[in-house]
Amino acid sequence: MFSSHLEAEKQCLLNCIEAIRKSGSVAPARYFLTTTTTTSEAGKTYYYARLVKEESVGKQTVRSLGRIGSGQHRAWERSIARRDAIVELEQQLKLLDELMQRQQERSHLVDRDFSEPEKD
């Protein structure tokens, strides 16, 4: 038997994950953002956002998202933030499941009478 508080926490984590998924698109794994700069002949520096996908070890696909702060850039920032939040919540969920399993397996150690026997 495990704590009802743990079961409630598990449900809370699952609800949070579901809410994040419903709030918008979630970036796939191995996608991240980088920035690059370009300097014009007049000396003005422009900053651009790039979306990078790691294909395999050492291989990357790069796609320009326009200037930093552009609509595409902000959309990917939010998408990656949602992914990172889901990954964190899933890790917490895994730890919680392990704790619940441990409680279930070791309940015989805790669910017994520890009181002193009555003296006559």
Predicted segments, located by residue:
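Conserved glycine(s) in the ABC-transporter nucleotide-binding domain "signature"
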Residues: 1-120
